[in-house]
Amino acid sequence: KPFAKIQDGMTAIPYGEIYDENGNINPYPIEGDANYLNLLMNNKSNWRNQSQNTKLYVNPYIKITPIKGLTWESRVNGTLTYSRSNSFQGDGSYNFYKAGGNVETDTNAKITQNRSYNYKWENIVTYNFNIAKIHEFTLTGVSTWNHNQTDNTEMTGTGIANNKYLWEGLEKAAVQKNSSSYSMSKGVGL
């Protein structure tokens, strides 16, 4: 979350000192009241959120009629996706103070990456014919092949002592956690 929820902004007391005597953001604008946080605390040095998403869809097909009544259609549907999300909540951010303001437990960064691809290849053969000009028949055969693959990784770090690291220095975090997953499935149908 980049800053307070909208209801926090709507119910905030409009009194207090937004800046201290040095011109810095005052985290607690109402003196002696730690329940109200300054809604202007997040800036580029103490909070970041970045997302990248790419999706590619491909759907080529071919349809051939080699003789009267016979058609063959072949279709390929493919999808490639990639997403990456980076987040950083550092010393001095709104969420840092909201969580308690402890550098060892309330500063964190996360990188999440998801990649997947899948495709489906379908072949459809159809034959139309008449018998004695009064009966019309249609025969259809279908085959399908599909393949799905996904891998996900997530890296998190808690206890980041310096805001300059953002998510790029997770090895410097006091507590690190990494996880990954992979799944694949294939199928054929007639």
Regions found by a protein language model. Name each.
Residues 1-57, 73-188:
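Surface-exposed loop/interface segments of Gram-negative outer-membrane beta-barrel transport/assembly proteins
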Residues 63-68:
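Long hydrophobic segments that form regular secondary structure
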